Amino acid sequence: RSSAASDVYKRQNIMMETEKVKCLIVGSGPAGYTAAIYAGRANLSPVLYAGLQPGGQLTTTTDVENFPGYPQGIGGPELMEDLRKQAERFGADLRYGVATAANLAEAPYKITIDDEKMIEAETLIIATGAAAKYLGLEDEKKYAGMGVSACATCDGFFYRKKTVAVVGGGDTACEEAVYLAGLAAKVYLIVRKPYLRASKIMQERVMKHDKIEVLFEHNAVGLFGENGVEGVHLVQRMGEPDEKRYDVAIDGFFLAIGHKPNSDIFKPYVDTDEVGYIVTEPGTPRTKVPGVFAAGDVADPHYRQAITAAGTGCQAAIEAERYLSAKGLI
């Protein structure tokens, strides 16, 4: 934390509207909302900023079938709406806005919202989630919204009886491929390695599906089309003596190659792993900064489930309450 950085914050402090809160939650997936429910019930008057995607990744999921208590399953958006209402019922102040800068050098912790408002928080719960990764091809930007997607359940409907490609070799890629195969005429699964990393059950589903063709040891290196995606440039066994380049006609190109945690603004202060997941004390949501907790996918490289995110949101709120109590702040 250079003095230049703190000078910027001093200047921002003078210019910005500042609000003091006991408990600030950034992010509104299952982790953020569950933290808000528990913090609200503990009379911490929590303030939650919803972030770029209110409701989080689950709002892009049609059916959640593995969340306990819903034997028939529930839609992702419906589940998040229920959590939101529950948080509101217990007094959480839920707002739209994105955390754009952070200064966790000392308490109260300063979080800038939308580059225009400063929140000074005695405790901070980081529940900012993770965002889908892209390959980094220029064409991904060019065809964004015109055939390129990172969410099969959001956009699969547009590809009924069409041909699509899914990139990736893990569970997500296999799940997306199977989901799309229920809509599309044909699905290519483009896998860089000579094998799938997915769970056995997902591998079997993919390999047995008559609409899915798996292209092992293939790289997607570009897309083409006049008014949207019409095909993909592929390289088989890239860099090998028998490397082969060819094109396949497709209408849609779906990315399923993992996620990047939304932790960048906190990195100067909390520890992160090589991918960017926030490192917490084992078995707790505690970061190395006292009073700052991380919950949900932003701190979870292993499970990334709605129920585990909710569980860590609960833990973070309980930790925040204990921290404030020990400091005599409640």
Role assignments for model-derived ranges:
Residues V21-F90, C174-K200, D273:
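Beta1-alpha1 glycine-rich phosphate/pyrophosphate-binding loop at the start
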Residues L94-F157:
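Glycine/small-residue-rich loop that forms an oxyanion/phosphate-binding "nest" at active or ligand-binding sites
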Residues R84-I113, M118-A121, G182-P282, R322-I330:
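A Rossmann-like FAD-binding core segment of flavoenzymes
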Residues R1-Q12:
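Single conserved hydrophobic/aromatic residue that forms the stacking wall/gate
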Residues E176, V298-I330:
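A conserved FAD-binding loop/helix module that cradles the flavin
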Residues A131, G136, K141-F158, I257-Y303, ...:
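FAD-site-proximal beta/loop scaffold in flavoenzymes
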Residues G29-P30, Q53, A130-A132, D171-T172, ...:
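Residue-level detector of alpha-helix initiation sites
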